[in-house]
């Protein structure tokens, strides 16, 4: 018998913009909430997502290639952070000893402005976890604090097999620390870059190398957003980009599963398809 002792509203919206025969690619936005007191458009990043998709009509095709800044939206940052944790700090890669972070507990693995806390009882997390999958009471813990690797995200089984500490939480509600730089200032200081609203690519390699298409994205040139861009490829390395952080935004988005800011990373290769 399975019983559920919590309840929430889960909202998922898919949409695209249309004007005449022109249309954008589909984009998805979603969040979890306990209350229906506020209009959906005021929650999470839905209003900005709708506006961004509207502004992605008639995109320009990127030509050539440059190495520059990648600005990740909060949703895309969460996606990248999930890949980082999966690639370097999760059960499988720690057990089979393929993680490049396996021997780096207590060492610096990221810029000191990066702090990632797993907190299932944070006030922004809707219906968080009270017990782990193994039956332990949950607790918050830091994965990365001020750039230093503090913990892996391990089950009891892998903890017993490897000797590393078990994670105090089975789920992964990440609270990513905000910075003190307004997003507008981050954009204004970007000479050549891309704001990535969605990433479409394969699984990163063991080393953290990634490559894929930047979807629902905007080109930044000379400190200004110059328009939507299509057929842009981005590539880099997950481990290296954490150390190539340029800025963390003051603004954050809470989607009911965690909190994330915008982050800008240098040294990313951006090229036309």
Named regions from a protein language model:
Residues 1-129, 136, 145-146, 224, ...:
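Active-site bordering "gate/hinge" segments
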Residues 103-273:
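Dual-mode signal for accessory low-complexity, basic/Gly-rich regions
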